[in-house]
């Protein structure tokens, strides 16, 4: 959560004496900038002003972002600002403003800038200047029909191997083991068989080391030119990933005939004239993709497994439907279950950074450049005026939708935001979908599953939003699976 990252430096100062004077100086400059009156401040959206002046809103946002945004909406309406320690954030609430938010062009409000708030430290300087070109290449490279068909075969193969291993271990932590499965699929499909055969484990270590440091408060508080341990570790892991990438690409070029018809995404970007000249940024691109494709896909699969255990009637219905649909990608009950998980367990915030001033409410409010603008997929998905009984996982809502439900994910509504909306949909939607479909279909078809020895989690509302993407369950949950007995 951005609030925690921007505020928590205060509690680290005594533990980081070598950086205290630098941090304090930066804070003073930032606070002066925040309180200095400007013309745009006269047209700024209202702030809820909870608690202690200047820091009360930020502290409340840090402590419980969902509750804060709900209370701020009640007090201020659908547009309000949150004065964070080193940034100003404007929050937009409601389907109408969601639609406007997703339709604003990238050169005005930047999704790339929002991603960069968290991931700029793991990318080579200059990478985000080419983000649009590289993201567009995902549609051409990953979403090719031949590529997706090939990827699904690999996914089913990896699912079979992963689940066989789960079945031999008694009980496994769902999120942790799903994380390993998703990583194997991402490396094999997007990077290629050579990365999978020779670099899989080291890449997983790099991913987790980066996850541990990416949210360090100094990475968000301090300018890039001020060194500190977390930034140095990120730089070391970033450079190691680049070394691995360059070594594997060099090996490929010594044996080009092997890779001539390869469907992996690295091969595509190296050969496509629109991206080949950006080879120096491709290591950063694939580092960012590891984060973007990993966290939310793990959440989608893991939460669906837990909800199927909690809803045995739907699990039985899903088994029957999978028996009637040899291609899991066409199984309505499976697609509905995954979609409902995407609604129920979505990320709290979506961020964009502003490059140009934008007026809201007919000029009543002005959002200036260099601010952050946010909407909440989580609160949109839990709005009872949009979704009936939103606090419950009910995949049937997608199987027999009324007219309102059928329109939720079109540009006019922007009420279902798992993969964005309007002209800003996630280009990895298809791949994330087949990864989830492949593992879940294999699990339900071939295995029976029960809770681990600890039983079901005592609190499935203990959501961990600390990662970049959809929440995981705090403390994880264990399950045991065993092969189904042939009938």
UniProtKB/Swiss-Prot annotation:
UniProt-listed SUPFAM superfamilies: Cytochrome P450
Cellular localisation: Membrane
GO molecular function: heme binding; iron ion binding; monooxygenase activity; oxidoreductase activity, acting on paired donors, with incorporation or reduction of molecular oxygen
Domain of life of the organism encoding this protein: Eukaryota
PROSITE patterns: CYTOCHROME_P450 (PS00086)
E.C. number: 1.14.14.-
Cofactor(s) in the UniProt record: heme
Annotated keywords: Heme, Iron, Membrane, Metal-binding, Monooxygenase, Oxidoreductase, Transmembrane, Transmembrane helix
Pfam families cross-referenced by the UniProt entry: p450 (PF00067)
Membrane topology recorded in Swiss-Prot or TrEMBL: Single-pass membrane protein
Keyword check for Transmembrane: yes
Keyword Ubl conjugation attributed: no
Matching Gene3D superfamilies: Cytochrome P450
Listed transmembrane segments: 17-37
Family, per entry: Belongs to the cytochrome P450 family.
Function noted in UniProt: The subsequent chain release by Dieckmann condensation (DKC) could be catalyzed by the TE domain present at the C-terminus of pyvA and/or the alpha/beta hydrolase pyvD, installing the tetramic acid moiety.
Name of this protein: Cytochrome P450 monooxygenase pyvB
Organism in which the protein naturally occurs: Aspergillus violaceofuscus (strain CBS 115571)
